[in-house]
C-alpha cells in the first residue's frame, strides 16, 4: 500500500484543489478510488498521478507524470495545457471520455501520441424494484454546469412526488 498511500497523500495535500480529496466525491475523485481499489500497489510505482490540474508545481522530475484530466477545456485547471513547455513535461494525459479528449486536442493542440482515454465507470448495480409513486432525480456533475438554475427551477415546480439529490464535488 506504499504507492497507493503516496498517491492519496499527494491528492489530499494538493493546495490548489478547491476541496481536499478526502472530502470530495466528484467523478474524477471516484474514478481514482476505483483505480486504487482494483489495481495492485506496484502498478503505481514511479507514477506521479496528477488529478485534473495542469499545475507546474505538481510535476515530479523523477516520476512518470500522468495527468488524469476530467475537467472541460474552459476550467482554470486546464489553462497550462496551452503551454507546450508544460505538456512536454507530461508523459501521458488520460481523459475520462473520447469527447473530452477531442475537445482538449482541438483547444490545446495536445499530441494524440501522449493521450489516452479511460472511460468513466461505476460499480455494478443490483437493480431492485422501486416504488412507482415517487421519482428520484440525481444531479451528479460539477456546480458550474447549471446547478444554480436547476435548483431554482426545481423549487419553482413544487413537485410533491419528485426528489432531487445533488451529488457535487464542491460546496454549493
Question: What are these language model-derived features?
Answer:
Residues 47-77, 91-95, 116-118:
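Active-site proximal beta-strand in glycosyltransferases
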Residues 42-43, 55-62, 87, 107-109, ...:
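Short loop/helix-cap segments at secondary-structure boundaries that form the rim of catalytic
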Residues 80-91:
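A conserved, positively charged/aromatic
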Residues 91-114:
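A short, active-site helix/loop in glycosyltransferases that binds the activated sugar's phosphate group
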Residues 124, 131-172:
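Conserved catalytic-core segment of nucleotide-activated headgroup transferases in glycan assembly
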Residues 1-54, 58:
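N-terminal pre-catalytic "stem/leader" segment of glycosyltransferase-like enzymes
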Residues 77-78, 105-106, 116-136:
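Acidic anion/phosphate-binding donor-loop and adjacent secondary structure
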Residues 99, 121, 170:
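Carbohydrate-associated surface elements
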Amino acid at each position: 500500500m506504499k504507492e497507493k498511500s503516496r498517491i492519496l497523500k499527494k491528492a489530499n495535500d494538493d493546495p490548489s484543489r478547491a476541496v481536499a480529496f478526502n472530502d470530495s466525491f466528484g467523478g474524477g475523485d471516484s474514478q481514482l478510488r476505483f483505480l486504487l481499489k482494483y489495481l495492485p500497489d506496484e502498478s503505481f510505482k514511479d507514477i506521479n498521478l496528477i488529478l485534473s490540474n495542469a499545475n507546474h508545481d505538481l510535476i515530479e522530475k523523477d516520476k512518470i507524470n500522468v495527468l488524469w484530466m476530467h475537467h472541460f477545456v474552459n476550467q482554470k485547471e486546464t489553462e497550462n495545457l496551452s503551454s507546450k513547455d508544460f505538456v512536454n513535461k507530461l508523459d501521458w494525459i488520460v481523459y475520462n471520455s473520447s469527447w473530452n479528449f477531442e475537445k482538449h486536442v482541438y483547444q490545446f493542440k495536445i499530441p494524440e501520441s501522449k493521450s489516452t482515454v479511460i472511460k468513466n465507470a461505476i460499480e455494478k448495480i443490483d437493480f431492485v424494484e422501486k416504488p412507482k409513486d415517487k421519482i428520484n432525480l440525481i444531479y451528479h456533475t460539477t456546480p458550474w454546469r447549471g446547478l444554480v438554475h436547476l435548483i431554482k427551477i426545481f423549487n419553482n415546480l413544487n413537485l410533491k412526488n419528485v426528489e432531487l439529490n445533488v451529488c457535487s464535488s464542491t460546496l454549493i
